[in-house]
């Protein structure tokens, strides 16, 4: 009968256990890199929105709406829901147009949804869908590169 002898298997198993212990942290770092790529794509799409300073053209975005979206764009805190790590690129805060209904200003997330999906008075401009389509492959490769680099660092 043949005999096989492995050398260094204990060290290899120890490194694999280190990766297993740090999985959530590794995933969060990789996810953040992917979200950063997506946030950059969304920012460029928001900057490319057609802008006007008059409220008479329904398909146009008002300049203060775009400025509010750019100021409120960010990456949300990471959530760990039973081993599923997630985050989102979203719009936070308010723009400068105050009203009786919105004394702090209109919520940027509401403005983004209205621009993206359209309303009865505004033609839709799906900038988020375009940003996701443009950035998906780059975000996946950024996450993969981060994960590979972190795993290679542990496996040294």
Per-region residue spans from a language model:
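Phenylalanine-focused residue identity feature
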Residues: 6, 91-94, 127
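Alpha-helix initiation and N-capping motif
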Residues: 6-9, 39, 66, 108, ...
